A protein has these predicted regions:
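Short, solvent-exposed loop/turn segments at secondary-structure junctions
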Residues: 1, 91-93, 116, 137-139, ...
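Non-heme Fe(II)-dependent double-stranded beta-helix
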Residues: 1-111, 120
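Non-heme Fe(II)/2-oxoglutarate
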Residues: 17, 160-161, 188-190, 195-264
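Short, surface-exposed loop/helix-turn segments at secondary-structure junctions
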Residues: 34-36, 107-113, 163-175, 226-232
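Short edge-strand/loop segments of extracellular domains
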Residues: 96, 147-154, 208, 214-219
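A short secondary-structure junction signal
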Residues: 97-106, 111, 121-122, 140-146, ...
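Short, conserved beta-strand element in jelly-roll/cupin
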Residues: 112, 116-139, 182-185, 190, ...
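Double-stranded beta-helix
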Residues: 137-196
């Protein structure tokens, strides 16, 4: 994880120098930690914040981590030897409550299943969610909660709620035991797509950084056909693994341009 953290620290430092040169912040805050620096910058100017997700920053270390050999060993035990990385991939900088650009709670996800946010084409297929904190995830800074007992019910009804996002309808969530999952930096949470989960508000004064990724058997639909997937591991066809960073960058650039209605 450290190369990913270093990459993000370098980007934030570069952007901080830009903002300072434009008189948009009062200082660089270079003495502050990875968990703290973005908070201090965003208190003065938050234009960096929307740039940080993996498909926008598109860092080389992030690309390499998607197919990290140690991670692939874990994923292959569940998915099998032919693995594709879904385009549902995020690096999340969860700011303290109320500090995100629109004034809402940044990355406070409501109760949902990952199966509820993909197109129906993916419904018959297994998709594995991998969630990793880049810093310690606690109840104070907004760790995850899950309701494991409901996964046996399959896909529950979801709806889009203004200011909240896609969430499970209330009547589908009976009184069940909720597990709160504080985690250490570098630990891994594995979820199948039917486990209801949410993140809680960040009530600390630091950023809760995390990565969440989706993996599935190569050849199965991702439920996000408008964004790029790619092969990260293959025993039968090793040459099919995407190792070229520039190609991955271009795949995302073109997909994002098309989604805005702009032809590259």
């Amino acid at each position: 994880l450290d190369p990913v953290i270093d990459e993000y620290e370098a980007y934030i430092d570069w952007r901080a120098h830009q903002l300072l040169s434009e008189d948009k912040i009062s200082q660089l805050y270079s003495h502050q930690s990875f968990e703290q620096r973005l908070v201090s910058i965003c208190r003065e100017n938050n234009e960096i914040y929307p740039e940080l997700d993996i498909m926008y920053l598109r860092g080389k270390a992030s690309f390499q981590f998607l197919k990290n050999p140690n991670l692939m060993k874990v994923v292959s035990r569940i998915i099998g030897p032919e693995i594709t990385c879904s385009p549902i991939q995020h690096i999340r900088a969860k700011l303290p409550t109320g500090l995100s650009p629109d004034g809402s709670d940044a990355h406070v996800a409501p109760w949902h299943q990952d199966a509820g946010v993909t197109w129906p084409e993916a419904d018959p297929y297994f998709i594995l969610t991998v969630w990793l904190p880049l810093v310690q995830a606690t109840e104070e800074n907004g760790c995850l909660q899950i309701i494991p007992s409901l996964q046996k019910k399959g896909l529950l009804r979801h709806h889009s709620q203004a200011g909240v996002g896609t969430t499970i309808v209330d009547e589908e969530l009976p009184d069940q035991k909720i597990l709160t999952l504080p985690m250490q930096k570098g630990s891994i949470l594995l979820l199948n797509k039917d486990i209801p989960h949410r993140s809680i508000p960040n009530r600390s004064d630091t950023v809760r950084w995390s990565i969440d990724l989706r993996y599935q058997k190569t050849g199965t639909p991702t439920g996000r056909p408008f964004h790029p997937d790619f092969v990260v591991y293959s025993e039968s066809s090793p040459h099919s693994v995407l190792n070229d960073y520039d190609t991955w960058q271009q795949m995302w650039i073109q997909a994002l341009e098309k989604s805005r209605g702009v032809q590259p």
